[in-house]
A protein has these predicted regions:
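Membrane-anchoring hydrophobic segments
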Residues: 1-78
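FNR/FR-type flavoprotein reductase catalytic core
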Residues: 6-9, 13, 64-172, 239, ...
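Long, contiguous hydrophobic alpha-helical segments, chiefly transmembrane helices and signal peptides
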Residues: 37-38, 43-44, 55-56, 61, ...
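Membrane-interface capping segments at transmembrane-helix boundaries
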Residues: 48-49, 114-115, 171-180
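Generic structural "secondary-structure junction" signal
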Residues: 57, 235, 276-278
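Juxtamembrane/interfacial segments around transmembrane helices
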Residues: 58-61, 80-88, 146-160, 178-189, ...
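Ferredoxin-reductase
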Residues: 176-266, 308, 315-317, 328, ...
Length: 377
């Protein structure tokens, strides 16, 4: 399992927490685990390259991030009920109760996220940091000298608390300012069909990436969210970078309808571990809809193909397909590139039960989650 280092990091954190609290204050095991889980939640949200490497992909980091945040809420609610509620005259209890209610409110907002504007959801989400600070006040005021004198417990709690505080501070106050070192502007826009647009960007310095990766893009144009959004890289070289964006929400609709040449942008770095270059000499590519983007990136970077590739591109109707001319041209110039176009309106859905997958081939898939789950069975 390629994400084994990341899982070891999470499991070791919880085991260390259990052993430390058992040897000192076992009655506080549940809130101790909640504190560790919350700290891990903030750490996992930093998008640090080391974490992405440990978990073999940012999407896996996000999956564990969701797990630790949900686990934190469950542990805090259980702690609240086991203590008979936290309302009381002591200030420490008040801090604890405030933290729990903010956390629960954020969870409700997370479930309602698709019904509110992303920018509003993002700012509400930041209240978690305030709740985390309240929670730390609660822990240190309740535990007193056990956490204020140097011992294994105080070292463990202090270390995770400090890492959580630093991670949260970085996410909220620093990431937007220092996390996007590649500045640039839009030099060309192309509408590929009725809902998909290609963006060409000229950056202030060369951008390193590998075909199959994605990056977070910030757009500085009136009427656009200030928050960064992830998009697959569809090509580029040196200071030129391409993104292909499908209209699938408020932000992407705004890009399709209103984005203008000359607008300033910034990019953080390349993410993702679907590195086509690292695959075997015999490969199978499977793309659905806008999932063709990472493969287009590879095609643009490798005009002469040095691998045997079977490429299956599935789309629903010719009006929804993109880059068809480019694919046909590439297939003509590269005999070892076998192109299979699958129009689900005419040919039904892509099915490999009757199709032969070459032995010892690297298989890469990108597209709708339902398609990938179906083909992975």
């Amino acid at each position: 399992m390629k994400s084994i280092k990341g899982l070891h990091f999470i499991i070791a954190s919880f085991i260390l927490t259990i052993l430390t609290w058992m040897n000192t204050s076992p009655q506080f095991m549940i809130p101790g685990l909640a504190l560790t889980s919350l700290s891990l939640t903030f750490i996992l949200a930093t998008r640090l390259p080391l974490l992405e490497s440990w978990f073999h992909g940012l999407e896996k980091v996000y999956t564990v991030h969701k797990f630790t945040s949900f686990l934190s809420i469950i542990l805090l609610i259980f702690h609240n009920f086991s203590m008979g509620g936290l309302w009381g005259s002591r200030l420490a209890a008040q801090f604890g109760n405030l933290a729990i209610y903010i956390f629960v409110s954020i969870i409700l907002v997370a479930y309602l996220g698709k019904y509110i504007q992303y920018e509003a959801w993002r700012w509400i989400h930041r209240l978690v940091y305030l709740a985390y600070i309240f929670g730390l006040f609660h822990v240190y005021m309740m535990m007193g000298n056990r956490l204020l004198t140097f011992n294994l417990l105080s070292f463990l709690v202090g270390s995770y608390a400090l890492l959580g505080l630093l991670a949260g501070f970085y996410i909220i106050f620093l990431y937007q300012k220092i996390g996007f070192p590649y500045l640039g502007k839009i030099t060309n826009l192309k509408r590929l069909n009725h809902d998909t647009r290609e963006i060409q960007i000229h950056l202030s310095r060369p951008f390193d990436y590998q075909s199959g990766q994605f990056a977070f893009l910030k757009i500085f144009q009136e009427g656009f969210e200030s928050a960064p959004h992830p998009f697959s890289i569809s090509g580029g070289h040196g200071q030129t970078l391409y993104f292909t964006v499908k209209n699938s929400g408020d932000h992407t609709k705004n890009i399709y309808d209103n984005l203008q040449v000359g607008s300033k942008v910034s990019v953080d770095r390349a993410y993702g571990h679907m590195i086509i270059e690292e695959g075997r000499e015999n490969q199978v590519w499977i793309a659905g809809g806008i999932g063709i983007t990472p493969f287009i990136s590879y095609i643009r970077e490798h005009p002469i193909l040095d691998k045997q590739v079977h490429f299956y591109y599935s789309f629903r109707g010719e009006e929804n397909a993109v880059y068809i001319d480019l694919l046909h041209d590439y297939a003509q110039k590269n005999p070892n590139f076998e192109l299979h176009l699958v129009d689900s309106r005419k040919d039904a859905y892509l099915n490999f039960e009757q199709k032969e997958v070459p032995e010892h081939a690297s298989v890469y898939m990108c597209g709708p989650l339902s398609m990938m789950k179906s083909l992975a069975k």
